[in-house]
Amino acid sequence: EREQVSNLYLVPTLYHMLIEHPAFARERVASVEKIGFAGAPMSDGLMRRVEQAFQPQLFVNHYGSSEIYTFTIDQQASRKPGSSGRSALNQRVRVVPIDAESAQVQVKPMEEGQIVADLASDEAFEGYLNRSEATAKALREGWYFTGDTGYFDEDGDLFVTGRVDDLIITGGENISPVEIENVLSLHPAVEEVVVVGLPDEQWGKIIAAFIKLRAEVSESELDAYCITSGLAKFKRPRRYQFIDEIPKSPVGKVLRRVLLAQHQEQAQKG
């Protein structure tokens, strides 16, 4: 407000902290015209609230990594929530089968797979220092295997759905936590949500939602909301756990394994 900042480039967690702060007001950020985010996906619910709070001229989703700074960019992120846009300048991105060893076979539009990026980009790294096994796993035939999951829609826009390691396999189905998180994040009583898989003897994993609330809501109400939102039955959470805080790294990334370690026993008891 004092400095009349016109551009913001933050991780989603910092946008959440800003707009949820008691002192936040639209008039205090009226000078901000352009905003961007990177470092983690922004849920549909948070994106809607950020759009309403800042009403920016430009809303950029910058998808990249430390290994290759930019994969794709969407300069109007809120027009299609979840979209990471198209390949950046001098970059090529593909989606290949989850367990692919080569980048030559690509999946069809709307089919989820692993995201890979061309190493010919000027922003690309050459490998991990003194980590030959990690380099061999990530770099194959001139492509960087990101470990991220996603898909291209029919328009050619990339959607990042999570990490290969975070996929929940339940009853033989691969389920992305992000899809479920996006649905629940739009419920007015939900402030933040993280979806994980809990071990289960029958299903392998069951879907559990850890939720920080902004208002009272019951598990049955949330389940009904998932139904009306069109979420398939096998993707709906079997457990809901209401918690005070969601653990995050210093840069705002959700620490799913820390969350599981903190709450797994209680969540499994239901």
Regions found by a protein language model. Name each.
Residues 2-10, 19-82, 88-92, 104:
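Gly/Ser/Thr-rich phosphate-binding loop
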Residues 8-11, 93, 119-121, 126-127, ...:
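AMP-binding/adenylate-forming catalytic core of the ANL superfamily
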Residues 16, 48, 82, 133, ...:
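Active-site phosphate/pyrophosphate- and oxyanion-stabilizing loops and adjacent acidic/basic residues
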Residues 29-32, 190, 237:
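Core-facing hydrophobic residues within beta-strands of well-ordered domains
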Residues 37, 195, 239-242:
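Hydrophobic/anchoring residues in structured secondary elements
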Residues 90, 101-137, 175:
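Conserved ATP/PPi-binding loop(s) of AMP-dependent carboxylate-activating enzymes
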Residues 240-251:
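Short proline/glycine- and acidic-rich turn/helix-capping motifs at secondary-structure junctions
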Residues 261-270:
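Acidic/polar alpha-helix N-cap and adjacent early helical turns
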